[in-house]
A protein has these predicted regions:
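Beta-rich carbohydrate-recognition and catalytic domains
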Residues: 1-84, 92-148, 162-238, 247-294, ...
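Conserved beta-strand position repeated once per blade in WD40 beta-propeller domains
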Residues: 29-32, 88-90, 156-158, 242-244, ...
């Protein structure tokens, strides 16, 4: 229905690992905000830095032209200091310029193997263009948090806006480490009002059958994606939400990428209602071996509008947009190749 109208262009940007910013290791999707002069500020997560949070300025196809500086967090009593961290994985710009960050939070130790490894999604707010942020708190967790030596990473919080609600998608883990893709939903109006007062909105996970009444903290969300190129078992899809989402105006539907680990593909999903994501296509791939596996995974993609019809934060794109992808060596995590290609809608 939708994928027949998608046209995938050739790469227009290829940045080899040696040409990436010095000591830079991609550890999250870039979040773009277009400035009045046409330049774009990109919020980045850099595992090679302490702290992780960086801002770059560039163009639609060249995100690392200049280093702006760090952006800083008020952790609001949440654990801070390496290896704990906050990542503004998706940044939404309000009409008054206030920025809302959909945040990936980690609290664990790389050195103590008996430590609890905890992942959450939370909300942050900035009122100075993104240089300083306040972390209002966690809105979503999973039941495998607080279990020793369990690595239940919730992903990169790809987020859309539909009918006055944020929908943020994540890796859910049911008891027994059964992984699926689920979502949380929360009101845009309530979120803006709450964050202005450094508080949190009400948040509910997807419960299945069109219902949203499962607690964000303490409940287990139902699968919201049930198919992939590799499986029809929603708990064995081989997809991961370190990715991005947007609304495409000419298609009148929502788009969301999913990375696939050693399959080496980037899958583009389509949805009309933000709840059913049955249609998909492979939109980028790394070179594979004779067994169909790749030395590269493709996490940390993002959308940047190329039509002039989308939002400055790329929560909406027009009939042409740029797809940014990272080809990251699975056996050598700091190794990144950065690619940009143009996608058009017919």
């Amino acid at each position: 229905m939708f994928k027949e109208r998608i046209r995938i262009g050739e790469y227009v940007t290829r940045i080899e690992d040696k040409d990436m910013p010095p000591k830079f290791t991609m550890d999250g999707s870039l979040s773009p905000i277009k400035n009045p002069d046409g330049s774009i500020t990109y919020f980045a997560t850099d595992l090679g830095a302490r702290p992780y949070c960086r801002m770059f300025k560039g163009t639609e196809t060249s995100p690392f032209d200049s280093f702006v500086g760090e952006y800083f967090w008020n952790y609001n009593c949440y654990p801070e200091g390496y290896p704990n961290g906050l990542w503004a994985q998706t940044v939404y710009r309000c009409d008054d310029g206030m920025l809302i960050g959909i945040v990936h939070r980690e609290n664990f130790s790389y050195t103590d193997k008996t430590s609890l490894i905890n992942y959450h999604i939370g909300l942050g707010v900035s009122e100075d263009g993104g240089r300083h942020w306040f972390y209002a708190g966690d809105i979503c967790g999973n039941c495998c948090n607080y279990v020793p030596r369990v690595h239940a990473n919730m992903g990169g919080c790809p987020t859309i806006v539909k009918d006055g609600y944020f929908y943020s998608y994540f890796n859910e883990f049911a008891p027994g480490m059964k992984k699926c893709i689920s979502a949380v939903r929360f009101s845009v109006e309530e979120t803006v009002s709450a964050l202005k007062n450094k508080k949190l909105p009400r948040v509910y996970k997807y419960s299945g059958d069109g219902k949203w009444d499962t607690k964000g903290i303490g409940g287990t969300g139902a699968p919201i994606i049930t198919k992939s190129p590799y499986s029809d078992n929603p708990y064995n899809l081989s997809i991961d939400s370190h990715s991005k989402a947007t609304y495409c105006k000419p298609l009148d539907c929502y788009l969301m990428t999913m990375q696939t680990g050693s399959h080496g593909d980037l899958v583009l999903y389509f949805s009309k209602d933000a709840e059913h994501w049955d249609e998909y296509m492979i939109i980028d791939s790394a070179e594979k071996d004779e067994n169909g596996m790749s030395k590269f995974m493709l996490p940390y993609s993002c959308f940047v509008d190329a039509s002039g019809e989308g939002r400055a934060d790329s929560f909406e794109v027009g009939g042409a947009f740029w797809l940014h992808t990272v080809h990251k060596k699975i056996s050598e995590y700091p190794y990144d190749e950065y690619y940009v290609k143009k996608i058009t809608v017919e």
